[in-house]
């Protein structure tokens, strides 16, 4: 009964969100910034800010990130060589439209033996509560870990002005991290995007 009730609430919630997004109600928080047709995308080597995220509750997400136990972790502790961070919003129509493409990017990485254990993807929900992030995950069947950023603290540290924004970070699993890519407004081709991430990270 509780599961059915939750599903109904999520369904209503997503319908309302879709209506508000389509009407432009949340337009100020979700935009493609000036630049190319898909926004700004450029190499942006530099420091990646330190912040902590909650260790995922599900074993699948913990295993994917190479984490264990409970508490918090830093992006640099993820067991990988590169982490692609998507900053999204549940209410962002651009994020909604590109959700399937980002899911395909995840699958593309997972199918490549040379990248599967080296490149990981996570999402951070700008101004989204845990409930909104869960609703986004369920509605768009997102296969990679998502984290809420309800107070925008992480989003502001990252320097993100609009959603979606993609950030490429090199990591070593021990806490060291460096930004190598910053792209506002998404990207148009998964293969080209992944090739660029690999090139910039030195994989």
Question: Where in the sequence are the language-model features?
Answer:
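Bacterial N-terminal signal peptides that target proteins for export
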Residues: 2-13
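Bacterial N-terminal signal peptides
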Residues: 12-22
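N-terminal "domain-start" segment that seeds a small globular fold
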Residues: 30-74
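Short pre-active-site segment immediately N-terminal to redox-active cysteine/selenocysteine motifs
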Residues: 81-83, 88-91, 162
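Conserved redox-active cysteine motifs that mediate thiol-disulfide chemistry
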Residues: 87-104
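Conserved segment of the thioredoxin-like fold in thiol-based oxidoreductases
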Residues: 111-150
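Short, internal strand/loop/helix patches
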Residues: 136-172
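Thiol-/selenol-based redox modules, centered on thioredoxin-like
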Residues: 168-203
């Amino acid at each position: 009964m509780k599961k059915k009730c939750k599903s109904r609430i999520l369904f209503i919630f997503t319908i309302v969100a879709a209506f508000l997004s389509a009407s432009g109600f949340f337009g100020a928080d979700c935009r493609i910034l000036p630049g190319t047709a898909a926004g700004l995308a450029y190499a942006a080597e530099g420091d990646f800010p330190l912040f902590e995220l909650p260790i995922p509750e599900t074993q699948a997400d913990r295993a994917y990130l190479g984490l264990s136990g409970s508490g918090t972790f830093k992006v640099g502790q993820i067991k990988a060589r590169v982490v692609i961070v998507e900053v999204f919003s549940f209410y962002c129509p651009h994020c909604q439209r590109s959700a399937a493409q980002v899911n395909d990017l995840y699958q593309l990485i997972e199918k490549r033996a040379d990248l599967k254990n080296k490149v990981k993807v996570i999402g951070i929900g700008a101004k989204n509560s845990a409930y909104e992030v869960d609703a986004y995950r369920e509605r768009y069947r997102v296969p990679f870990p998502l984290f809420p950023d309800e107070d925008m603290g992480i989003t502001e540290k990252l320097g993100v002005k609009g959603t979606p924004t993609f950030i490429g970070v090199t990591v070593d699993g021990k806490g060291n991290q460096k930004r190598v890519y910053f792209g506002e407004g998404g990207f148009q081709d998964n293969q080209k995007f992944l090739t660029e991430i690999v090139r910039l990270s030195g994989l």
